[in-house]
């Protein structure tokens, strides 16, 4: 419908956050919103380049309604249990005077600058020097100007913007710091000044840390010692204790190198490991002293001076460190440097001397007592045992006992006989001394050997009373040897040394008849037989000239045989072993010269001729003498001719065997062809 107007939807009402029960009017609510909400910035906010360091915050709402006296006093450090109670009591008694002197000095001088304490765990190198330098600069900055720098403002704004990111443990630490500062009666202007000073310290620290710390190097340094030394910088140089002098030396050179820090740390560690008990005893006293100092500083009225510092509480890692020590038993470097206790040191030096004196006195007393005891005779508690008697020898057997008795009787008889003979020989020697000295020497030797009684076992030894025959012959006089004849001497030489031994064999049995009937052959070595036999036999024959002229070869051979048979007997023919039968007759040579001409023509007729030649050879060899046979061999050269004939005959035989009995090679070839065609 065109006449109708579209309805307007009203806006949804928005709920406003108000503290009152009834809603306000629109103008009033707009003014409240404008006042409560900050205006939006036109430009982009400044973002800090690095994360700001956590700063101590104050609780304005809590501190405003509370008085300074009503606040509870929280201790700086948790007390640590000590096991060595006796040493602590001694140290407390010895250091009471020093504590009184320190309290009097602190009450006289107003300490204006107190540096913040840090935890001793893993402090980076170069941090100690930066802390002292920052403390001095912060004091000078507070005197000259109270307005913070723009960099400090940015860091302060960034820290305020990141308040929501702070952990609860840091909040607890902040609250502890707020309690220890005791700044309830200060105005807002004074609080702003404190914040500016803290920002200056943080900025200077961050700036110097970037310059001084190279890389990620970390050195465990005892910072608590440096903090105490920084707190005592306001004291005059004429200090009583050694710690004041060392603090002045260390603060004069804030820009110390890394090498000095390392040396300082090594010295501290050596002292800690050398005397850990003294350090434990002194740490508790230092803690108490620090607590008193802090109480005095807080009790003094704080004027409107520009240079104001805040004592920071210990780090939040103290309870966690103690818990970790109890769990893991890991040693931790103490926070404060131990102070020398001169009286306790003197007492400890005196103790070993007194102990040594006591020990020496005890040693002297023991020596005197031992000397006195050595003079007094001691009665043994037990009597000494008697030695056991020697073992009784066993009784010998009956045979051994009888043998020993027999030997004793024989020795007694020998001694009795030797005594009589020695008396007779002594009288005879006195009479014959001048006559014959050789006889006396022999008799003395005989007496000496007779006294031995056969103690030495010699081969062929008889009874102990009787000397062996070899000694008797040597000791016998030369007259007795001359009296004996040659036959007796030969019999004595050939006589056996001992008796004949019986042959071992089966007893009670007879030998077999063959063995018993065998006659024993006895050889006489002294007899010699001479045998004569002929080694050579010589036969004589006629000369060549006579044989050729007188007789024919056949007759000559027959005559030679007859003469030989007559001249040589039959026994000599059998016994003569060596005969020279090498003679040849001259008629054989003529026949052998004729043989090669007839051998080729009549091969069959050759056999009877060879037999006849052999017979003639035997006849001629028997008839000729060896000298003649040798002469004939050298002159006629028949052996060479025979060898040549034998070689020719062997060659002919070999040709026949190879050709198969045919004289010519052509005939053999024709015969092979005929046999091949026939097949």
Swiss-Prot record:
Biased composition (Basic residues): 110-119, 501-512
Organism superkingdom: Eukaryota
Region (Disordered): 1-85, 110-522, 549-580, 593-679
Start-end of Polar residues biased regions: 133-149, 164-178, 296-323, 414-427, 437-452, 603-614
Positions carrying Phosphothreonine: 18, 58, 85, 277, 552
Region of interest (Interaction with SH3 domain of ABP1), ranges: 383-396
Disulfide cross-links: none
UniProt-annotated location(s): Cytoplasm, Cytoskeleton, Actin patch
Cellular component annotations (GO), alphabetically ordered: actin cortical patch
Keywords associated with the record: Cytoplasm, Cytoskeleton, Phosphoprotein
Amino acid composition bias (Basic and acidic residues), ranges on this chain: 9-19, 179-213, 243-272, 339-361, 372-383, 471-482, 556-576, 667-679
Presence of keyword Cytoplasm: yes
Post-translational modification Phosphoserine, affected residues: 36, 70, 104, 183, 206, 231, 284, 324, 576, 620, 623, 625, 627, 667, 671, 675, 678
Family: Belongs to the AIM21 family.
Function description: Involved in mitochondrial migration along actin filaments.
Subunit structure: Interacts with ribosomes. Interacts with ABP1.
Descriptive protein name: Altered inheritance of mitochondria protein 21
Organism: Saccharomyces cerevisiae (strain Lalvin EC1118 / Prise de mousse)
Annotated gene: AIM21
